[in-house]
Structure formats: C-alpha cells, structure tokens
Regions:
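Contiguous mid-protein beta-loop-alpha structural module that forms a pocket-lining wall or clamp
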Residues: 2-5
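Non-catalytic DNA-recognition/assembly elements of restriction-modification systems
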Residues: 7-46, 176, 181-206
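Short coil/turn segments at secondary-structure boundaries
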Residues: 28-31, 48-55, 158-159
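Sequence-specific dsDNA recognition surfaces
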Residues: 36-52, 66-98
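A short beta-sheet element
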Residues: 64-65, 88-147
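A short glycine-rich beta-alpha junction/loop motif
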Residues: 121-129, 137, 160-188
C-alpha cells in the first residue's frame, strides 16, 4: 500500500514539473508575484483541550498536526474533543480547503495538504493555517507548489523560532514569498489529473 501511495504522489509531482517546470529557475517564464497577490485570506486554527484518542463516529474532533504534514490530507489523524459543545464551526475543515502547517520541526514545517474529501466536524488546530486563494491561483496549484522539492528551501527560509525542535512561520512572512503565477487556465490542467489520482489513492487507503 505504502509503495502504491508513494508512486501516486510521485505522479502528482511529475505532472506539476511537466506543466510548469522548476518553480525557482522558472524556465517557462511565468509571471512571478508575491503570494499575497494570490490569496484572499489566511485563516487561523484554534487551540482546544482534547482527548488523546481519535474520535468515534462523527463526534467533534481536532486534527493532529500529522493530518497535514506529509503532503496529503489524513482526516483519521485526529483527537476527540472533551465536550461536543466545544465545536467551533469557523475552524471546521471543508472539501476544497488547503491546509498549511505553520509550526513543526524544521524539516517538516510549511507543508501543505489539499482536502479532496473530509468527514464532518473535524477542526483545524492552531498549528495549521487555511490558505484561501483568489481568482489568480487555484488551491491545487498552490498545494503542489508549496510541497515541490525545489521550492521547499523558500518555505523553510521564512521559518523562525529559537527552539531547534520547532520552527514557526508567520502570516506576514508567508504572504511575502515570491511565487510563479501561470495563467489560471494552465493551473487548472493539474486538476483533472490530481482528482483522478486522489480518488484511486483513497480507494487504496480504505
């Protein structure tokens, strides 16, 4: 299973490079803009007191950092809330969201996960941002860009923090990074491929 998932992830990455080239060297000459020009907003998660165990059924729960750390969305990585009444709708995760780990170990900080499907009543912790793009960029394009191997040093370069064990990325620093911004029609070419890939991936995970 793991091997199949790795192969599918490699296929996603290869398609991105095929369409857009190296996002740092930018051999195709795409426009380069600050990320802030492509974002409508960045939403914060929230800090909760929760159980150490995963939820049962649709009981409200908070995602663990590992739900968005490895490039794909893992809703089963969650911790149940202590009380159902603690649920906060504004930080619930929805289909189509792009999650970004703002705090993590230095090598894993600033990874992104796109939400193709999600069970209800799962919420973002305060260690995760939701990146909401505007009409200039698709969330799927930004997801693949952030996790692109050549682009990782840019993300890691804006992380800070005194502790060697944990790095942190602020909204302001994130908004100021420079990104390639191909025409939206080009960006959308990724979507057909990736949605098919992710469906087959979900079947293998069941």
């Amino acid at each position: 299973r793991k091997q199949e998932l790795m192969n599918l992830n490699e296929l996603m990455k290869a398609r991105f490079v095929e369409l857009f080239g190296d996002p740092i060297k930018n051999p195709k000459g795409w426009d380069v803009v600050k990320l802030s020009k492509c974002l409508e907003r960045i939403d914060n998660g929230k800090s909760f007191t929760c159980d150490s165990n995963a939820r049962e059924g649709a009981f409200p729960a908070i995602l663990k950092l590992s739900a968005a750390t490895y490039g794909d969305y893992r809703p089963y990585e969650n911790k149940a809330l202590l009380e159902e009444t603690q649920f906060v709708e504004s930080v619930e995760v929805h289909r189509g969201d792009l999650l970004f780990t703002r705090k993590n170990t230095p090598d894993l900080v600033g990874m992104a996960a796109y939400v193709f499907e999600t069970p209800e009543k799962l919420m973002m912790p305060d260690l995760i941002f939701r990146l909401v793009t505007n009409e200039r960029m698709t969330p799927i394009f930004l997801w693949q860009l952030i996790n692109n191997r050549e682009f990782r040093p840019v993300i890691q370069g804006i992380s800070g923090g005194s502790a060697k064990s944990m790095s942190n990325i602020s909204k302001e620093r994130l908004k100021n990074i420079e990104v390639i911004c191909p025409p939206i029609s080009e960006q959308k070419k990724l979507e057909g491929v990736l949605e098919q890939v992710d469906k087959s991936k979900l079947k293998k995970l069941r």
